[in-house]
């Protein structure tokens, strides 16, 4: 589908008339999100990848952290197809873990640590 062509579901979406020259669709590569980040890191080594509370991580450092986390998960026995629950606040380490799991083919199930106990129990049961 061309970027400027609407699919049948979009033809009844009146807000699209206000998009102007903005494409209706973006083309994305058929790769994992971790692979997309790693490819970007090849080109943008020293460019800021994450900025958090005054600390900036370059793409080079991001890849190092992803690789370290991935090695740790593999050492724990995590493998492709596994689902791993991560209960962390929105900090860089949560990002490293998510990409690391994606890189090894596992799935990150992210839970916000301020969720109620009943919600956390529900989420943990859902991922089994």
Q: Which stretches of residues belong to each language-model region?
A:
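Flexible, non-catalytic linker and terminal segments flanking ANL/adenylate-forming cores
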Residues: 1-30
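Residue-level signal for pocket-adjacent positions within structured domains
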Residues: 19-23, 45, 106-109
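Structural core segment of the AMP-binding/adenylate-forming
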Residues: 1-4, 76, 103-128
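Conserved AMP-binding/adenylate-forming core of the ANL superfamily
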Residues: 27-30, 38, 46-99, 116-121
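Generic hydrophobic, helix-prone segments enriched in Leu/Val/Ile
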Residues: 6-16, 53-56, 110, 115
């Amino acid at each position: 589908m061309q970027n400027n062509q609407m699919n049948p579901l979009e033809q009844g979406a009146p807000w699209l008339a206000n998009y102007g020259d903005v494409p209706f669709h973006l083309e994305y590569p058929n790769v994992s999100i971790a692979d997309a980040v790693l490819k970007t890191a090849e080109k943008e080594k020293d460019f800021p990848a994450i900025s958090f509370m005054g600390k900036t991580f370059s793409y080079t450092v991001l890849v190092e952290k992803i690789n370290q986390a991935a090695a740790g998960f593999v050492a724990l026995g995590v493998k492709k197809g596994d689902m791993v629950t991560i209960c962390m606040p929105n900090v860089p380490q949560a990002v490293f873990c998510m990409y690391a799991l994606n890189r090894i083919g596992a799935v990150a199930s992210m839970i916000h640590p301020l969720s109620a106990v009943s919600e956390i129990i529900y989420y943990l049961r859902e991922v089994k």
